[in-house]
């Protein structure tokens, strides 16, 4: 055991001693609240010592103790901050403990009306879950909650960023209707801003691919509708690719479909999300040529 861990354990013992003294009759008469403040300081210092030793579990425990004492003393904001500190330690070793701490922090901030803070913490939880494919549904849930709070605070840009994550993962989980709805909403929102207008092209492209995953005819109608909403979309490589893919699927030409994707990818690299969706469309066409 290193020096820092030894000091941290001493500080924890000191904190517990102060709390025991505070509970006694004389403690309550003579500066009981000061003893609690001293105990909080000991736990926070111990937490930092454990952090220096990279003992993340013990560090998290110390910040949780400090948070509980802050909450008991009525210092809700400080309690929220300590739960966040605890979460940052736990997330290096135990995602669920990290999430539990952030949820406690969120409860405090929503009760205080600090919805932007609550939204950011929901976003952090979503980010923790998104690294595990088995937790994508949980990630979606927290991104949606974050977006909801951001919208309530008029942070439209932050809300849209979260909703785009929801759409991305919804499509991965084959909930294409949900993904389409979000991409279309965010595209429409982007068209209202001269700065964001150009990004609508990507969202329409993603929505069209989701349509193509469900129904060829729907995809054909959708891209015509998108071209009316945003005429510049018609001149884009994305629009032309969707058009060619639709034609190849209509003709049951899988080789043509593959070539069109390769040509596009040679100039504009397709990331894993696009590749996954396109492979699913190709596989479905292989298995059931009559997509119409």
Swiss-Prot record:
What Gene3D superfamilies does its record include?
Tetratricopeptide repeat domain (1.25.40.10)
Q: Which residues form a coiled coil?
A: none
**Where does the UniProt annotation locate this protein?**
Cytoplasmic vesicle; Membrane
The alphabetized list of GO BP terms reads: chemical synaptic transmission; compound eye morphogenesis; imaginal disc-derived wing expansion; intra-Golgi vesicle-mediated transport; intracellular protein transport; mitotic cytokinesis; neuromuscular synaptic transmission; neurotransmitter secretion
Pfam family of the protein (one)? SNAP
Topology in the lipid bilayer is annotated as:
Peripheral membrane protein
A GO term for molecular function: syntaxin binding
Q: Name one GO cellular component term.
A: terminal bouton
Q: Which domain of life is it from?
A: Eukaryota
Which keywords appear in this protein's UniProt record, sorted alphabetically? Cytoplasmic vesicle, ER-Golgi transport, Membrane, Protein transport, Transport
Please describe what this protein does: Required for vesicular transport between the endoplasmic reticulum and the Golgi apparatus. Also between the endosome and phagosome.
UniProt-listed PANTHER family:
ALPHA-SOLUBLE NSF ATTACHMENT PROTEIN, SOLUBLE NSF ATTACHMENT PROTEIN SNAP
Describe the family membership recorded for this protein in Swiss-Prot or TrEMBL: Belongs to the SNAP family.
Q: What name does the UniProt record give this protein?
A: Alpha-soluble NSF attachment protein
Annotated organism of origin: Drosophila melanogaster
